[in-house]
């Protein structure tokens, strides 16, 4: 039988209803930490919404917190049909907690359809034996089922049947920012880089603007997905948390995330602030400036962390020119590079109190985008044309072996399952 999730409960609104008890398996080299104990496998889920203490219907920056979830409940047979029985040639990618397949559904009813008929969707089939897989599935349904914004990926439906856990998303044909940014010998044009981070910033600003803020906790280039127009949408809410309540400054939680992006205060103490997301956003800004990955153990000692390595260079406008990606030379002005360095440096401030709010970041980036008037944009136009010819898969969310610096490599998560 398929399962329908109860988002609301009459129990105390101070609890989230998320309970996972697990031991920790530690892995090195930035791969995911997982657990194998204690997952609930009943065919129905009765749990309180994480949004039970947020005012419903809040509209902010063209987004809203929905009064009730609008998700289609699929049975397992539906999704077997939509993916040709999960055949290997339908698989888009895989990770530590499951695999993602290309599927087909009716564009109007979202009912499963024959391959090649209707619209393409992305179907994530999670590993039901993993407690973390179950926790992430539940978190995605809770958050993406209740949040609507043009810069958040749309969750269309879900399935929980026996031990099967699946999620159905809109398909993002242009892949992820990561899949474009770190391609070898094919630099991604500056105009698209700035457009994409502005869209991502708007999505993050929306999460932070809710009456009870949502902390995304896993902001990184591989989680910024792109539609056919290169409009950015945040994906993967498996680690998202509600922000602090009752005028507290932070929430305390087990340390989970991705090396190179996690804020220093969170790594040191487990204290998670709304502005911990701002730090991660600053890391992505540094990535689009340099074309280098946030964390790479193949780099020389002292350069593994992009932030630790290049933070000192950002305050010197002459050095900023030296760290900019050589592949996009001529596509931006000196003023643009200097202003980008300034907002990036502000975002990666060691003290979260000194970081800007994401709404301010959006305004600054929009201003910078308007500054970028270069004499000759022919190289940019050609680069955009080259990018448009390729649509790399973006669902390979497991860390792989790192090769050369510009070789595509998704950083893996660290951390243990949360209680």
Curated annotation (Swiss-Prot):
Domain Protein kinase: from-to ranges: 86-368
Localization per record: Cell membrane; Nucleus
Pfam family, one: PK_Tyr_Ser-Thr
Residues annotated for ATP binding in this entry: 92-100, 124
Entries under InterPro entries matching the protein: Kinase-like_dom_sf (IPR011009), Plant_Ser_Thr_Prot_Kinase (IPR050823), Prot_kinase_dom (IPR000719), Protein_kinase_ATP_BS (IPR017441), Ser-Thr/Tyr_kinase_cat_dom (IPR001245), Ser/Thr_kinase_AS (IPR008271)
Annotated signal sequence range: none
Covalently lipidated residues, kind S-palmitoyl cysteine: 4
EC number(s) per entry: 2.7.11.1
Residues modified to Phosphothreonine: 253, 258
Lipidation (N-myristoyl glycine): 2
Region of interest (Disordered), residue spans: 8-48, 378-419
GO terms (BP aspect): negative regulation of floral organ abscission
Active site residues per record: 218 (proton acceptor)
Polar residues compositional bias, start-end: 15-48, 378-390
TM annotation in the entry: none
Keywords attached to this entry: ATP-binding, Cell membrane, Kinase, Lipoprotein, Membrane, Myristate, Nucleotide-binding, Nucleus, Palmitate, Phosphoprotein, Serine/threonine-protein kinase, Transferase
Catalytic reaction equation(s): L-seryl-[protein] + ATP = O-phospho-L-seryl-[protein] + ADP + H(+); L-threonyl-[protein] + ATP = O-phospho-L-threonyl-[protein] + ADP + H(+)
Cited CDD domains: STKc_IRAK
Family: Belongs to the protein kinase superfamily. Ser/Thr protein kinase family.
Subunit: Interacts with SOBIR1/EVR and RLK5/HAE.
Name this protein carries in UniProt: Probable serine/threonine-protein kinase CST
Source organism per UniProt: Arabidopsis thaliana
């Amino acid at each position: 039988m398929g399962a329908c999730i109860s988002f609301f409960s009459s129990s105390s609104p101070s609890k989230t209803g998320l309970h996972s008890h697990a031991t920790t398996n530690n892995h090195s080299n930035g791969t995911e930490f997982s657990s194998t104990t204690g997952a609930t496998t009943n065919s129905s889920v009765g749990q309180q919404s994480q949004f039970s203490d947020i005012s419903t219907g809040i509209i902010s920056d063209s987004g809203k917190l929905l009064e009730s979830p609008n998700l289609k409940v699929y049975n397992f047979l539906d999704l077997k049909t939509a993916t040709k029985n999960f055949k290997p040639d339908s698989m888009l990618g895989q990770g530590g907690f499951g695999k993602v397949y290309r599927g087909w559904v009716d564009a109007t009813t979202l009912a499963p359809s024959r391959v090649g008929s209707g619209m393409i969707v992305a179907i994530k089939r999670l590993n039901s034996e993993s407690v973390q897989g179950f926790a992430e599935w539940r978190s995605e349904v809770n958050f993406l089922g209740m949040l609507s914004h043009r810069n958040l990926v749309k969750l269309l439906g879900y399935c929980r049947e026996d031990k099967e856990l699946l999620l159905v998303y809109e398909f993002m044909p242009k892949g992820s920012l990561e899949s474009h940014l770190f391609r070898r010998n094919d630099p991604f044009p500056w105009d698209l880089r700035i457009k994409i981070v502005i869209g991502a910033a708007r999505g993050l600003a929306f999460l932070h603007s809710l009456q009870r803020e949502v902390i995304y906790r896993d902001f990184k280039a591989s989680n910024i997905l792109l539609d056919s127009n290169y409009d950015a949408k945040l994906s993967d809410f498996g680690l998202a948390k509600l922000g602090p309540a009752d005028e507290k400054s932070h929430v305390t939680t087990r340390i989970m995330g991705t090396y190179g992006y996690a804020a220093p205060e969170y790594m040191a103490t487990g204290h998670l602030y709304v502005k911990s997301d701002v730090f991660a956003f600053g890391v992505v800004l540094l990535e689009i400036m340099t074309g280098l990955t946030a964390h790479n153990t193949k780099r020389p000692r002292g350069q593994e962390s992009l932030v630790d390595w290049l933070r000192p260079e950002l305050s010197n406008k002459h050095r900023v020119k030296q760290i900019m990606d050589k592949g996009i030379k001529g596509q931006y002005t000196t003023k643009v590079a200097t202003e980008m360095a300034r907002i990036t440096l502000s975002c990666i401030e060691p003290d979260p109190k000194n970081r800007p709010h994401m709404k301010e970041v959006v305004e600054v980036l929009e201003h910078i985008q308007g500054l970028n008037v270069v004499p000759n944009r022919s190289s940019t136009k050609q680069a955009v044309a080259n990018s448009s010819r390729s649509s790399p898969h973006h669902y390979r969310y497991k860390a792989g072996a790192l090769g050369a610096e510009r070789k595509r490599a998704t950083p893996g998560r660290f951390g243990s399952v949360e209680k």
